[in-house]
């Protein structure tokens, strides 16, 4: 055999072996992917995301479909329209979507008159160079890009809840150090509560008569859906949607649209979703912490527990949870102050499975 023929044969053999290796790698990938992980037992939302990604949709597209299904179903009254009235009785929407490949993010906050939060966030990602739009500006953008609106986001249930709250002297609420303390506003600062007294004998400072209120957080007034999807190619995306805290002060933005707090994703590492007391959690960016801890070698469970413990050390009355998934599809959750459940579907499961995490 001529030298040139030998070279051609060897080159062909090497090419065949490389293609075989790629095919084997893709086969292995398809065995463990896709994966859908979501906070809480939002089964229909996970099924919607699974149908999309199992039929070839990208991770971003599947996240949008899953969170959108939860919005349409008004999951627990805390996602989508018709729930969580603020002090004025109005429902507003927070949402976020993040692509772990490009690190692009689209988000909307305190969005009025448009019910499709996750689709609005996706439009921000696709058709603007911004990361976050808020308030009526977010609404106008979403409507201009084709989403239905403006519309009233209240429901008979949310109106009734708000009316009952008003009859109960607007209690409980998220105000502090104001007068009146036990009735509806208008509110003014309680300056006497902000006086600082210095104890000369101990050199310590004490706040005079500052009112303490336990956190107004529970599974039915802070239920964010936060979802992570790994598609058939191993790419990851995350998304969140919520109508926020019930009886919040108008204009309040929770952690739902804050990247790194409610959700975070990086194709090189994995993703995270969070739920709970967003006003506290956004101060710690727990999902960014989870992903970075996994980058440093922590397993999902260890990373999730570490992120939650960082918050609990500073705020022992905090209530919240995170769910972590690494780039291989391994998942775990951690929580504090409540029992947490999260949902998963992958190729090894016939249907969605719910995992329970104890505090």
Swiss-Prot record:
Gene Ontology terms: biological process: proteolysis
SUPFAM superfamilies membership: N-terminal nucleophile aminohydrolases (Ntn hydrolases) (SSF56235)
Active site: 224 (nucleophile)
Enzyme Commission designation: 3.4.19.5
Keyword Protease: yes
Binding site for substrate: 252-255, 275-278
Transit peptide as UniProt keyword: no
Key words, A-Z: Autocatalytic cleavage, Hydrolase, Protease
Alphabetized Gene3D superfamilies for the sequence: (Glycosyl)asparaginase
Post-translational modification: Cleaved into an alpha and beta chain by autocatalysis; this activates the enzyme. The N-terminal residue of the beta subunit is responsible for the nucleophile hydrolase activity.
Molecular function per GO: beta-aspartyl-peptidase activity; hydrolase activity, acting on carbon-nitrogen (but not peptide) bonds, in linear amides
Site (Cleavage): 223-224
Catalysed reactions, semicolon-separated: Cleavage of a beta-linked Asp residue from the N-terminus of a polypeptide
InterPro entries (alphabetical): Ntn_hydrolases_N, Peptidase_T2
Family listed: Belongs to the Ntn-hydrolase family.
Quaternary structure annotation from Swiss-Prot or TrEMBL: Heterotetramer of two alpha and two beta chains arranged as a dimer of alpha/beta heterodimers.
Record's function text: Acts in asparagine catabolism but also in the final steps of protein degradation via hydrolysis of a range of isoaspartyl dipeptides.
Protein name: Probable isoaspartyl peptidase/L-asparaginase 3
UniProt source species: Arabidopsis thaliana
């Amino acid at each position: 055999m001529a030298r040139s023929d030998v070279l051609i044969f060897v080159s062909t053999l090497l090419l065949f072996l490389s293609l075989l290796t790629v095919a084997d790698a893709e086969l292995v990938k398809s065995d463990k992917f896709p994966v859908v992980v979501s906070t809480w037992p939002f089964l229909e939302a996970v099924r919607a995301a699974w149908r999309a990604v199992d039929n070839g949709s990208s991770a971003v597209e599947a996240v949008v479909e899953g969170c959108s299904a939860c919005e349409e179903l008004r999951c627990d009254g805390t996602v989508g329209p018709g729930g969580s009235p603020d002090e004025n009785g109005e429902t507003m929407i927070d949402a976020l979507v993040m692509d772990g490949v490009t690190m692009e993010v689209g988000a909307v906050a305190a969005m009025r008159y448009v019910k499709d939060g996750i689709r609005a966030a996706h439009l921000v990602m696709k058709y603007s160079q911004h990361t976050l739009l808020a308030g009526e500006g977010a609404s106008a953008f979403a409507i201009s890009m084709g989403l239905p609106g403006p519309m009233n986001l209240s429901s008979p249930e949310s109106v009734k809840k708000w009316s009952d709250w008003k009859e109960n002297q607007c209690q409980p609420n998220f105000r502090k150090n104001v007068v009146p303390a036990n009735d509806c506003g208008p509110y003014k600062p309680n300056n006497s509560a902000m006086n600082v007294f210095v104890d000369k004998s101990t050199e310590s400072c004490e706040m005079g008569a500052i009112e303490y209120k336990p956190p107004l957080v529970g599974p039915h007034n802070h239920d964010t859906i936060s979802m992570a999807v790994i598609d058939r190619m191993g790419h990851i995306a995350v998304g969140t949607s919520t109508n926020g805290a019930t009886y919040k002060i108008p204009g309040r933005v929770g952690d739902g649209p804050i990247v790194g707090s409610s959700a975070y994703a990086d194709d090189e590492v994995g993703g995270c979703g969070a739920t709970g007391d967003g006003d506290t959690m956004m101060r710690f960016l727990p999902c960014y912490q989870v992903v970075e801890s996994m980058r440093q070698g922590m397993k999902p469970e260890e990373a999730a527990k570490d992120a939650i413990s960082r918050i609990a050390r500073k705020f022992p009355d905090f209530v919240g949870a995170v769910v972590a998934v690494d780039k291989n599809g391994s998942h775990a959750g951690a929580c504090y102050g409540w029992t947490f459940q999260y949902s998963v579907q992958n190729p090894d499961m016939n249907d969605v499975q719910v995992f329970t995490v104890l505090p």
